């Protein structure tokens, strides 16, 4: 789904990177020397994932992805039949699982997930990144790009120029907010 619509669900990086690799191999097989892969992430607005990522050691990509899950610490006394549990930071936790079998991310983790998605995609074959946002917000996208460029200095962004965004109104609001926050008399 579009990043500015409800109902987005992400997949673990391994699933997405398999698609990037498939495109890169298709370029090689077909002799496409100037093909460009644009990796899009809707993590900013996605509150759900279809599955828990596979992780083999603390700090690996799967562990980083799972660290964004909304979890509760549990003990053997409050484990239920059918519960899914993972080990995180030396504790046993239960990710919040919905009746749809989707798992919920913690609130407020969207920007950090976008940064991780983007860095991971660029390190694994993507040429450009596309971060889908709910509205055009230059400050928000700039903050994420600044974080990405700490790891990948030459990272390049493709940004959504969707007609469903009211660009003029949103930019005017951003200028107004900036002036108000800086104490200018408006």
Predicted regions and their residues:
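Alpha/beta enzyme core
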Residues: 1-186
């Amino acid at each position: 789904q579009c990043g500015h619509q409800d109902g987005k669900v992400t997949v673990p990086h391994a699933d997405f990177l398999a698609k990037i690799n498939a495109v890169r191999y298709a370029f090689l097989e077909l002799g496409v020397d100037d093909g460009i892969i644009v990796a899009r992430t809707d993590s900013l607005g996605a509150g759900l994932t279809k599955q828990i990522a596979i992780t083999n050691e603390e700090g690996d990509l799967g562990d980083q992805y799972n660290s964004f899950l909304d979890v509760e610490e549990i003990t053997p006394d409050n484990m239920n039949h059918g519960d899914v549990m993972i080990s995180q930071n030396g504790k046993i936790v239960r990710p919040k699982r919905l009746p749809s079998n989707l798992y919920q991310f913690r609130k407020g983790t969207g920007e950090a997930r976008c940064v991780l998605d983007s860095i991971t995609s660029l390190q694994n074959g993507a040429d450009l990144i596309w971060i889908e946002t709910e509205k055009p917000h230059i400050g928000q996208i700039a903050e994420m790009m600044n974080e990405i460029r700490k790891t990948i200095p030459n990272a390049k962004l493709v940004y959504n120029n969707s007609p469903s965004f009211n660009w003029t109104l949103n930019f005017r609001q951003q200028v107004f907010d900036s002036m108000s926050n800086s104490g200018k008399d408006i």
